[in-house]
């Protein structure tokens, strides 16, 4: 019997803060966020992720979408809190929406 806990998949939508400096905070920490995302992807935690945009024309980043494999919603919250975007104050953690998620098999 395996000691590894079952993992579940979650879809996360999280908005950035909306103050005047929010986008500059996001951009200043972006490389650290991407490095952490790469590490989490290699570890099998992050399935997919990307920026939410205000529009396709303007392409201003206003938040993030993530598909995360974790043991629980609580673990997802812990992962979000430790992300460079959250630590630097780019993400507004109060807006995080976490949904149980199943990918279509087609």
Task: State what each model feature region is.
Residues 1-106:
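Conserved, structured core segments of small domains
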